[in-house]
Curated annotation (Swiss-Prot):
Keywords: Ribonucleoprotein, Ribosomal protein, RNA-binding, rRNA-binding. Pfam families: Ribosomal_S18 (PF01084). HAMAP family: Ribosomal_bS18. Belongs to the bacterial ribosomal protein bS18 family. Part of the 30S ribosomal subunit. Forms a tight heterodimer with protein bS6. One of its GO terms (biological process) is translation. It comes from Streptococcus sanguinis (strain SK36). SUPFAM superfamilies: Ribosomal protein S18. This is Small ribosomal subunit protein bS18.
Length: 79
């Protein structure tokens, strides 16, 4: 049986960064924006982590994949 947490800790609602900043087109050349949605290892972060909507997550995903093909972003970041 799962135990309930005690205390007043309340999880903060994640805000869709793209919708909040009114970005209509996610450009694949804007690697600074796209790097917010990629992990340290180079993997695309899921919606539950970034807080983006489904529509904007699809835009981000296609932009990241285009940037990878154009060699603007790495497929894998091995440090």
């Amino acid at each position: 049986m799962a135990q309930q947490r005690r205390g007043g800790f309340k999880r903060r609602k994640k805000v869709d960064y793209i919708a909040a900043n009114k970005i209509e087109y996610v450009d694949y050349k804007d690697t600074e924006l796209l790097s917010r949605f990629v992990s340290e290892r180079g993997k695309i972060l899921p919606r539950r982590v970034t807080g983006t909507s489904a529509k904007n997550q699809r835009k981000v995903t296609t932009a990241i994949k285009r940037a990878r093909v154009m060699a603007l972003m790495p497929f894998v970041n091995e440090d």
